[in-house]
């Protein structure tokens, strides 16, 4: 089997296509969540904290020396980290709710009883069937 044919079979499997779609949708969803956090959630929080922009919060370990170009500022930018943590919790919550929904649907599908088998023929019906078959053979 050629490599190209094997690759086509691999790509044609439903799981690979589903995974690719999931990755693409996940990347798009990440952009939406980032925008939600940066442009919708954090501005009101910044307003409540006196106009503080969380994405700019940092701990300066070594300040920049304007007299020397060789000494740059070294800082831990924990504000951006706070934004990223909020984004993570939003994504994790949405994924959790989706998984919970899918599991509930699967549980409901599994709980649905299979269609009942037709009742077994009575002794009278069995006897009549045998008589019909015998008459059909005699013709």
UniProtKB/Swiss-Prot annotation:
SS bond partners: none
Transmembrane segments: 16-36, 79-99
GO function terms (MF aspect): mechanosensitive monoatomic ion channel activity
Record-linked InterPro entries: Mechanosensitive_channel_CS, MS_channel, MSC/AndL, MscL_channel
Topology versus the membrane: Multi-pass membrane protein
GO cellular component: plasma membrane
Pfam families: MscL (PF01741)
Keywords recorded for this protein, A-Z: Cell inner membrane, Cell membrane, Ion channel, Ion transport, Membrane, Transmembrane, Transmembrane helix, Transport
PANTHER family (UniProt xref): LARGE-CONDUCTANCE MECHANOSENSITIVE CHANNEL (PTHR30266:SF2), MECHANOSENSITIVE CHANNEL MSCL (PTHR30266)
NCBIfam families referenced in this protein's UniProt entry, alphabetically: mscL (TIGR00220), PRK00567.1-4 (NF001843)
Subunit text: Homopentamer.
Annotated function: Channel that opens in response to stretch forces in the membrane lipid bilayer. May participate in the regulation of osmotic pressure changes within the cell.
Recorded family membership: Belongs to the MscL family.
Record-given protein name: Large-conductance mechanosensitive channel
Lineage: Bacteria, Pseudomonadati, Pseudomonadota, Alphaproteobacteria, Caulobacterales
Gene name as annotated: mscL
């Amino acid at each position: 089997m050629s490599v190209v044919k094997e690759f086509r079979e691999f790509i044609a499997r439903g799981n690979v296509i589903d995974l690719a779609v999931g990755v693409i949708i996940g990347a798009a969803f990440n952009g939406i969540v980032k925008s939600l956090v940066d442009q919708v959630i954090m501005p009101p929080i910044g307003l409540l904290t006196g106009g503080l922009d969380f994405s700019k919060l940092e701990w300066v370990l070594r300040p920049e020396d304007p007299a020397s170009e060789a000494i740059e500022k070294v800082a831990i930018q924990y504000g951006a980290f706070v934004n990223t943590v909020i984004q993570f919790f939003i994504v994790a919550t949405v994924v959790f709710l989706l998984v919970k929904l899918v599991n509930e649907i699967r549980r409901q599908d599994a709980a649905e009883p299979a269609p009942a088998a037709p009742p077994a023929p009575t002794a009278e019906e069995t006897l009549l069937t045998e008589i019909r078959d015998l008459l059909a053979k005699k013709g």
